[in-house]
Each structure stands twice: as C-alpha cells, then as structure tokens.
Design a protein with these regions (language model features):
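Short beta-strand-initiation
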Residues: 38-40, 49-51, 147-149
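Hydrophobic membrane-insertion alpha-helices, especially the h-region
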Residues: 9-22
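Conserved small/polar residues in nucleotide/adenosyl-binding loops
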Residues: 1-5
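Short extracytoplasmic
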Residues: 42-72
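Intrinsically disordered, low-complexity boundary segments flanking structured domains
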Residues: 27-31, 50-54, 87
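A generic structural signal for short, solvent-exposed coil/turn residues
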Residues: 7, 35-37, 48, 57, ...
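Rieske [2Fe-2S] iron-sulfur-binding domain
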Residues: 74-163
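Aromatic-capped interface at the extracytoplasmic side
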Residues: 21-41
Length: 163
C-alpha cells in the first residue's frame, strides 16, 4: 500500500510540474494587449453628412464609412442581382441603409479604391480598373468579389463599433 501512495504522489507532482513548465510556453501564444486593442474601434459619425464618406484605419486596413443619400440607396436597391458579378442584395450589405461600412481594399490585388468615382458612382480602383457601385458591389473589372463588409454595430446613433 505504501508503494502505491508514493507512486500516486509522484505522478501528481510530475503532472503539476509539467503543467507549470508548459503554461508560460502556451500563454506566450496569446495575443498581447496591443493586438487586443486593435480588435475593435469605435468611430464617431455625428459630423458625416449625407453623401459624405470617411476613412478610418482598423487592423491596419482602411475602412470606408459612407453616409448614403436617398438617391444612392434607391439606386443600390434597384440593381437586379442578375447584373452583378458577385450577387448580393444591398440589404445584406448595409444593416442600416443610410450607412455603408466596408473594407477599403480592392478584392483584386489589394489597392485602395477611390470614392465617388467609376462608371457606377461608387468606387473605382485605379490600379486595374475595377468599378464598384454605391453598395460596394463589383460591377466591372477584374475584381472577383464585392468590397468586404467587416463585422460592425451601431453603439448609438452617432457611434459605429467595427470589429
């Protein structure tokens, strides 16, 4: 019986020792505070007027925040899905029709598109000629997909939390 107790105690001490030695190695793989701070960002949009857009950085990438006019919203909703290279309804891209939030990175080769340009009054990528509409959907050019919509939410009527 005495040998069994020594064996059990030795096993417990060994497991605890391995766990104590492994914990710092495993813990170093967690993101540090600076990375966690970049996970979300809050943007005050109270000064953005209809028809205007702003660009903010999130995780090192530009994010376009556009306050669309009634005309832009109507134009985006009127587009038939059969006309789109990457079909997506405007309602699925903008939780609040007045506000469009999307990554400002062309889905072709990662250039930054220009706002209020191109054949569809949305965005135009000067690198290779992709044209996006007022909902950020690819309409013409080499880009394979629409401009990406990040996870976001309205904290209140004047603040958008991205991430």
């Amino acid at each position: 019986m005495y040998k069994r107790q020594i064996y059990t105690a030795s096993t417990v001490v060994g497991v605890v020792g391995v766990g104590a030695a492994a914990w710092p190695l495993i813990d170093q793989m967690n993101p540090d505070a600076s990375v966690k701070a970049l996970a979300t960002t809050e943007v005050d949009v109270s000064l953005v007027k209809p028809g205007q857009s702003i660009t903010v950085l999130w995780r090192g990438k530009p994010v376009f925040i556009k306050r669309r006019t009634e005309n832009e919203i109507t134009e985006a909703k009127a587009v038939s899905l059969t006309e789109l290279k990457h079909p997506e309804k405007d309602e699925d891209r903008a939780s609040n029709p007045e506000w469009l939030v999307m990554l400002g990175v062309c889905t072709h080769l990662g250039c930054v598109p220009l706002a209020d340009k191109g054949d569809y009054n949305g965005w135009f990528c000067p690198c290779h000629g992709s044209h996006y509409d007022t909902s950020g959907r690819i309409r013409k050019g080499p880009a394979p997909t629409n401009l990406e919509i990040p996870k976001y939410e309205f904290v209140n009527s004047n603040t958008i939390k991205i991430g």
